[in-house]
């Protein structure tokens, strides 16, 4: 791997330097010393490391002749969103920002999706989930439940890029075991540090990255997962009664996010195998991704837009599983009371602990 090689101290995580006076590697932060030979193993691990390379097969296909005859493109002049609907679509508001949309012409100029997960839940289920989402929220203004107005509920097929890849991983973790004891004068803490290595290969299928810039990535990730066993070859018939968001983030521009998700999952999966320690953290990782493929899919999402006191609130529900997410307003008065109550409880608990310690000393 190109760049500067840096050794980290397993005790404090500081950068280790070579000390010419002692001819050893020394941490300038905690003064721990290491023989140079002990670091040769690290060099061997990195010697053959190569930069990550990933080639993706082109997703999506071409539309058959006449397949898009009944599809039309609508655009929002406010947020720039583009959606696709059939002749039966009666939408007049943008599902992303709530502003009016206009018909701009016959649908054209986009890849044909490879897969689609049809809607399993209807509009009635989305309304019920919203009411369920409001329950048990102690800091939610009481009048919000009755005064919030649902401006739009729209079933939208959101574009997703699905990435497959294999990950060859070499990871090194720093793990610790801590032992504490006391005598009549002092309290002692002994911490032992261990270097743990894991090697292996993981396969990833259908890692989703949404292809729409109009919907927050965090919002879409929050309603995951989608059950891929329900994904079927795309047919335009499934768009009837719904709208489909046109992708405006290409597969190529989505690769970086896919790589980050795959790398993060790889590190977490291998870290879960390092057991029997009090703490474990990643010290170094070399992950090579290969065999990459990408597919273009449409996933079902219910978008609910509500307004209250001049503010708009957007909620999303997984149209397959019913998972529901969305931000809610906070009652500032209730929040202050809750914080005061929490502060009082913590103060009382601290006083109680101090009183018990004082009582233990006099006894």
Where does each model-flagged region fall?
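Intrinsically disordered, low-complexity segments
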Residues: 2-4, 35-71, 105-132
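Residues immediately within or flanking Cys/His clusters that coordinate Zn2+
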Residues: 4-6, 22-24, 69-73, 91
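Short cysteine-rich clusters marking metal-coordination/redox-active sites
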Residues: 9-12, 27-30, 76-79, 94-97
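Cys/His-rich metal-chelating microdomains
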Residues: 13-15, 33, 81-82, 100
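Short, non-ligating residues that shape and space the ligands of small metal-coordination modules
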Residues: 18-19, 36-37, 85-86, 103-104
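Charged, low-complexity helical/coil segments in non-catalytic cytosolic or luminal regions
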Residues: 111-307, 358-363
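Extended, hydrophilic extramembrane loops/domains of integral membrane proteins
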Residues: 299-328
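Final/C-terminal transmembrane alpha-helix of multipass membrane proteins
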Residues: 337-356
């Amino acid at each position: 791997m190109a760049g500067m090689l840096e050794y980290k101290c397993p005790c404090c995580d500081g950068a280790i330097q070579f000390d010419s006076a002692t001819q050893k590697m020394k941490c300038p932060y905690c003064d721990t010393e290491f023989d140079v030979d002990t670091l040769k193993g690290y060099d061997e691990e990195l010697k053959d490391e190569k930069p990550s390379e990933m080639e993706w097969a082109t997703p999506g296909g071409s539309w058959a002749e006449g397949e898009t005859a009944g599809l039309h493109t609508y655009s929002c002049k406010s947020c720039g969103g583009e959606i696709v609907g059939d002749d039966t679509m009666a939408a007049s508001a943008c599902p992303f920002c709530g502003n009016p949309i206009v018909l701009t012409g016959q649908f054209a100029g986009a890849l044909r999706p490879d897969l689609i997960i049809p809607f399993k839940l209807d509009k009635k289920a989305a309304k019920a989930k919203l009411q369920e989402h409001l329950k048990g929220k102690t800091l939610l203004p009481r009048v919000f439940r009755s005064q919030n107005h649902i401006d739009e509920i729209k079933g939208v097929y959101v574009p997703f890029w699905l990435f497959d890849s294999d990950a060859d991983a070499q990871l090194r973790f720093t793990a610790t075991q801590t032992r504490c004891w006391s005598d009549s004068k002092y309290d002692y803490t002994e911490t032992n540090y261990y270097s743990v290595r894991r090697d292996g290969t993981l396969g990833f299928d259908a890692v989703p990255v949404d292809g729409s810039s109009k919907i927050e990535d965090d919002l879409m990730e929050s309603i995951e997962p989608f059950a891929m066993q329900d994904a079927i070859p795309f047919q335009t018939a499934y768009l009837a009664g719904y709208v489909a968001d046109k992708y405006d983030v290409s597969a190529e521009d989505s690769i970086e996010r896919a790589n980050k998700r795959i790398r993060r999952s790889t590190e977490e999966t291998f870290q879960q195998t390092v057991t029997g320690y009090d703490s474990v953290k990643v010290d170094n990782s070399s992950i090579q991704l290969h065999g990459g493929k990408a597919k273009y899919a449409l996933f079902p999402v219910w978008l609910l837009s509500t307004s209250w006191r001049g503010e708009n609130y957007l909620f999303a529900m997984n149209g397959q599983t019913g998972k529901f997410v969305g931000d809610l307003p906070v009652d500032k008065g209730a929040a202050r009371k809750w914080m005061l109550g929490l502060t009082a409880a913590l103060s009382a608990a601290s006083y109680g602990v101090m009183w018990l310690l004082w009582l233990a000393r006099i006894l």
